[in-house]
Structure formats: structure tokens, C-alpha cells
Regions:
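Extracellular parallel beta-helix/beta-solenoid repeat domains
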Residues: 1-317
């Protein structure tokens, strides 16, 4: 699908996700509401919105996502794994059953290859042709084999990723888990939102182990938001307001690029403000933190460069 626009649509209940977009180019949601009707407690039984290997521009503006049983949104791609190499043909496997059968590869697409252990990128190639073998497996012919390629390496289609993701003026809350999950290349702007989250408000990951959700972020700005995090201690929901936690073994380099957290108001009761690792550059500035104890101001990081300045802390009793 191309140029998908959904305006002022309300979904009161969904047995699964309320909105899911896959392999779409240019998607906008404006003024949409995912919220239960008067006699219901739950809106969607999974994520409110979900974007898989979409490209072009993704816009979410003035939307309300409340009372869903999982995250407000998740924007990501898919890692497949090399199961067999025959000449210039790669047999690629979808590793999670919820991804099986996705027509992910097309002639001309650029592929990035990674070592799944430390998720280090080591080469690129282009798709010449692609065909489906079965629900789990596809055969992709490429223009060349990157040096060092081996079975069990990970493959990401970097042409099936958004150039711009903009989330602005949205409200999330009353839900399980987290608010915004972002694992994609391109420019990401999360601005002027009101987020109420039981786990992390912003979750940036990437993994080649279980969900196989790609990929590294390159340019993320989180600014001018009102963020309230309970960080209730549920495993997998995050202990920080902003979690940047790629699932990898010890890596010799960074996985994510530049992340800026600027001019937000955070309200937290426990856990650190930011937990980030394997990030090239992290900037935390001009934020106001209202918290119950000093631990909530901590920034736990294993980043190449950290800029932490002009943040204020107010302690509540």
C-alpha cells in the first residue's frame, strides 16, 4: 500500500492490534482514538498501533491510545537469518512465527548483513530476485556476497525502513507495558506528547534473538513531552523512562546512532531516568525531572559520547 491516510477514526475494541501497517509507503494517522467504549475496560488486546517494514514517512498526530493490553506503538523492521548459501543465492529464514510469509524482499532492495552475536554490521548487497520457498523460508539472489558472510548471519532490508517518523500531540496511558517502541533507521521526532506509562515511555532496542526486530536508530529526538512513568518493575517493560537496550553480546562498537532527549518534563517514582548502551552519541539536556528519590535522576550508560547538561531535579515527598 502507498500513501495511507486515516483521519478521525475511533476504535473502541480489537481482538488483536487496533492498527497494523506492514510494507506500506507513507502512512499518516491523524486525530485517531483507540479507547474503550463506556462499558469496556480494554480497547485493543495487543498494541494500539504497529508498523512493520514501512517506508517513506510515518506520521502520528493528535492521536489517543489508551487502555490497550500492550504498547501504544511499535515501529520496526524484521531480521531474517541466513540458513544456506548457494553461490549468490541466500536462503533466508523468518525466525519468529508472527513474521512468517511476509513478502519482505524485492529486486533492487539493499540488504545489510550483521553478525547476530554482537549485531555488528559487516556488509551490504542488493537483491536481484526473490522467491518464496515456504512460510518460513525465502530464496534471495544477490548481486554479490559480502566478505565474511556465513550461515546464521542476520539480514535487514534497509530500503524497507521509514525515512521519517513523526509522533506529535499524542496521548497514551492506562495500558500495560510501554508507550513508544522505536527500532528503525531514518529521522525520528517524538515531540509534544503526553505519555503515561507503566514501563518505559520510550523503548529503543533491536534484537536478533527472539522477536528479530530491526534495526538500529540513526537520529532520534525526544523533545517537549510530558512523561509520567511508574516503572512498576515488570520484567521486560523497562526500569527507566527512556530505555535504549539492544539485545546483544559484548560489542566492540556501538549499535545505535544519535539520540537527543531535550526539554521534556519527567515524573517518576522509581528507577533511573535513562538507561542506554551501545549508543554512538547520547544527549540529555534541558529536562525537568520531578521524582520521589535521587535514584530517578540517574543516567546509566555505556555510550561512546554522553552530553548531560542543564537538567533540573525536583524531589517530591
Amino acid at each position: 500500500c502507498r500513501n495511507v491516510r486515516i483521519d478521525n477514526v475511533t476504535i473502541h475494541h480489537s481482538e488483536g492490534m487496533a492498527f497494523i501497517f506492514q510494507l506500506c509507503h507513507n502512512v499518516s494517522l491523524t486525530g485517531c482514538r483507540i479507547e474503550p467504549s463506556e462499558n469496556r475496560l480494554i480497547s485493543s488486546c495487543a498494541d494500539a498501533t504497529h508498523f512493520v517494514n514501512c517506508s517513506g514517512d510515518i506520521l502520528m498526530k493528535d492521536c489517543v491510545m489508551e487502555s490497550q493490553c500492550d504498547d501504544a506503538t511499535n515501529v520496526h523492521g524484521i531480521y531474517t537469518r541466513v540458513q544456506k548459501i548457494e553461490g549468490n543465492r541466500l536462503y533466508l529464514q523468518f525466525m519468529h512465527n508472527q513474521q512468517e510469509g511476509v513478502p519482505l524482499y524485492h529486486a533492487g532492495d539493499r540488504l545489510c548483513l550483521i553478525k547476530c552475536g554482537d549485531m555488528t554490521a559487516f556488509g551490504e548487497c542488493r537483491v536481484v530476485s526473490a522467491e518464496r520457498v515456504n512460510g518460513q523460508l525465502c530464496c534471495v539472489s544477490v548481486d554479490r556476497l559480502p566478505e565474511g558472510i556465513a550461515e546464521q548471519d542476520g539480514v535487514e532490508n534497509i530500503d524497507r525502513a521509514p525515512e521519517n517518523v513523526t509522533i506529535t500531540g499524542c496521548v497514551t496511558g492506562k495500558n500495560r507495558a510501554r508507550s513508544f517502541l522505536i527500532s528503525c533507521r531514518g529521522h525520528v521526532r517524538i515531540t509534544g506528547n503526553e505519555l503515561h506509562s507503566n514501563g518505559a515511555a520510550i523503548w529503543i532496542s533491536g534484537d536478533c534473538r527472539y522477536w528479530y526486530e530491526s534495526g538500529p536508530v540513526e537520529d532520534v529526538e525526544v523533545s517537549g513531552n510530558q512523561i509520567e512513568c511508574k516503572n512498576s518493575g515488570i520484567v521486560g517493560w523497562g526500569t527507566a523512562a527512556v530505555e535504549v537496550v539492544p539485545e546483544l553480546e559484548q560489542s566492540p562498537t556501538y549499535y545505535h546512532g544519535r539520540i537527543v532527549i531535550d526539554g521534556n518534563v519527567f515524573r517518576k517514582s522509581r528507577g533511573p531516568l535513562v538507561h542506554a548502551r551501545y549508543v554512538r552519541e547520547l544527549e540529555v539536556k534541558n529536562n525537568r525531572l520531578i521524582c520521589a528519590d535521587a535514584q530517578a535522576a540517574e543516567i546509566l550508560t555505556r555510550c561512546c559520547t554522553l552530553h548531560n547538561r542543564n537538567n533540573t531535579i525536583e524531589t517530591e515527598t
